[in-house]
Every structure is written in C-alpha cells, then in structure tokens.
Amino acid sequence: MKKVKVQAIDINKTFGGGNDKVVAISDFNLEVKENEFTVLVGPSGCGKSTFLYMVAGFEKPTSGKILLDGKPITKPGPDRGFVFQEFVLYPWRTVLNNVTFGLEIAGVPKEVGRERAMHLIEMVGLDGFENAYPHTLSGGMKQRVGIARALAYDPEVLLMDEPFGSLDAQTRKIMQGELIGIWEKMKKTVIFVTHSVIEATYLADKIIVMTARPGRVKGIVDVDLARPRDYTGKKYLRIRGEVLGLLEEEVMKSLGKTLGKT
C-alpha cells in the first residue's frame, strides 16, 4: 500500500476580517498518496488554488495543518515544485538559464546545474531550444520550460495550478499527453488543479471534487483506467459523467442559483 505523502487535516482558510471576511476553505480534509496523480476540480472561487498555495507554503491555513511525510508545512521548500497558470519566465534569460535559475540561487555548481537542466529540457521536448528566449516560444513551449524549471530541484511533490488553462485546445491535449509521459518516467506525487472535467478524467488517478465556497471535499472519484486514455471510451465517459454529476450542483451554488431555477 502506498504511503500518505500529503495530508490536510481540518483546514480552514479565511481572508480579510469583519464585513470583508471571506471563508475560502472550511473543514477540508484530504490524503494524497505517494506517486499518485491527484486532480482537484470545483467551481470558480472554491479554494482549489488556495489549497495548492498552502501545500506550496506560499499561504498558511487559518486553522488546521498540512503535513508532508508527516511533518507540518510551514514555508516553501525544494521538496515541492510549482507550475503556475501564467508563463512566469524571465524574459531576459534563455530557456536554459530560466531552468537553472533556482539552482543558481541555491548554490548548485554551474556544471551540475547545467547538466540537470539540459536533461530536463530534453525530457520536456525542448532540446535544441536551450538558447532561445521566451518571446520566441509558443505558449505550449513556455509551459514546458515552466515544468522543467519546477522539476529542476528534483522535488518530491509537483504542484500545478491550471498549467494548461491558457493554451488552445489542440496544444492543451498534446501537453496533457506529454505531462503523463514525464510523470510516468519520474513518478512524482502530483497535485493538479483544473476547471476541466475532461482534463481531470484524462490525467488523474484520483479526482477530488470540491464544493462551492467555502471549499471542502464533496466527493472522491477513483479513475481506474489504463494509460494512454481514450476520450471516447465507455468507462472514461462513465467516470467523466460521475464527476460532472457531483460538480453540477456546486457550480450552480457558486452562481447563486439552485437546480431547477433559471
């Protein structure tokens, strides 16, 4: 049995105070197993990204705790890599130097960092582009750089906040396949946030469906499908339908409506 890698225990997160107080997450509990690909879906504003930021150490819970290998997360660390939705690249640095940036800050010897970065650049399909600058790259290529940079520290957990959300449909589909290929080679623990049920069902070992704000776990759907997955397969469509069924009412709630009303 796989061990629990990340555990959220009775998490509550609020922003602001008084009349401006917003409860983003309430009574949130979750276990993510080692080497598992876990995907969070839920309505806009339900706290998916907030939870990811707390696992990263960028935000702290108002109450409760998040554990990594049984130890509380209190700050960012090299054991967690983060891929943002936007292409957060340094425009004055080449692909290679974007990937090595964090390693340079950490004091990793230049040649060691370069060798590691070149290996990752090849893995994400950008060999030959190591000397290119971000403005010359397509959106999909930029996000490949972001993935390589997040993996440069060899983190145990990879956190991904809607990384393909701004890509066109065809590029997004290609990137999903490439991400699974990388994950199968490196077997990282992945926590991935998306609005797309299609994407979630294609990628995940386990899908966490969150309620409307304040976010909590509404349901957990195991995706017992071989990879690569067929978007038109009966079992795939059944699982996708199950997730949509859990999600529909929460989306309506987030819009201030109830089922059956217009």
Protein language model features and the residues they cover:
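Helix-to-loop junction immediately C-terminal to a conserved catalytic motif
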Residues: 56
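Conserved ABC transporter NBD signature motif
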Residues: 64-76
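Conserved ABC ATPase "signature" region
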Residues: 100, 104, 111-129, 181
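Hydrophobic anchor residue at the start of the ABC signature
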Residues: 147
